[in-house]
Amino acid sequence: MCIRDRAGWTPQLFFDHNGKFEDYLDSLRKYAGLKPPLAPHTGLKPIYDGFDGSPIYSTLDVLHSWKNALPSEPTRTITLFNLIALHDGNRTPGSGKSLDFKPRAERLLRDLNTFMNELEASGRPVLLLIVPEHGAAVRGDRIQMARLREIPSPHITHVPVFAKFFGLSTKSPEIVIDTPTSHLAVGELIARTITSGAYTHAKPLDLTALTSNLPQTWSVSENSNASVVQYKDNFWVKLQQSKWMPYKQ
């Protein structure tokens, strides 16, 4: 039994899509053990069509559907949102016209900001984590042009992670973690939060203690085309059967 189950937390799944492309939902069930049903999209209006033609719903509407589904009695839930409004290939519904990245990014940020303001006003104790899958390659470099992701370069694989506590008093100001971290640090932060008693005891949350000595991870990125690693202050790339060479950004 995982720490989530031992602590009495109920898992939930909310997507802005149907989860069928490349069997994403089934993969979560098979490899991550996430068994709850996917929250329905009843009453939600599509704002984009995905590259496979399936509907993509408003980020804010999906977040509101989570909030509206919360039981009136306090309960512990841990929710995975998977939001693909920024995926390449998204199009205007019914027209097939491609959409620029910037207005979609601005809309997503507005939706997230609105949702965070609503969380703040609600007083509900929440830890919100925003973890991008990868960068959009808006800018190119000396090896790979903009929008291409054939090589998992640092511009694509090094993404910021955002964590914010709502409804809890904290003893520390905003903290920036600039050490090399990965999903291991995110998982450790969640585990520490659950076991800290912050949600069951009326005591200030010590962010410094919560984030100190999080696991560090060397930068290693790989796909079917290439591998990219960081050694000291430089990045190196290996293309399939070729030798390692400097990745010149």
Q: Each PLM stretch: what is its role?
A:
Residues 17-21, 83-88, 133-137, 144, ...:
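Short, solvent-exposed loop/turn segments at secondary-structure junctions
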Residues 7, 19-23, 117-123, 138, ...:
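Membrane-interface soluble catalytic domains
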Residues 90-98, 141-144, 172-175:
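Short acidic, glycine/proline-rich loop/turn micro-motifs
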Residues 85, 103-106, 226-228, 234:
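Polyampholytic, low-complexity intrinsically disordered segments
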Residues 3-91, 183, 188-194, 199-208:
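Active-site-proximal alpha/beta segments of enzymes that process anionic O-linked groups
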Residues 56-74, 89-131, 185-187:
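A long, amphipathic alpha-helix that forms part
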Residues 1-3, 129:
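Extended C-terminal regions of large enzymes
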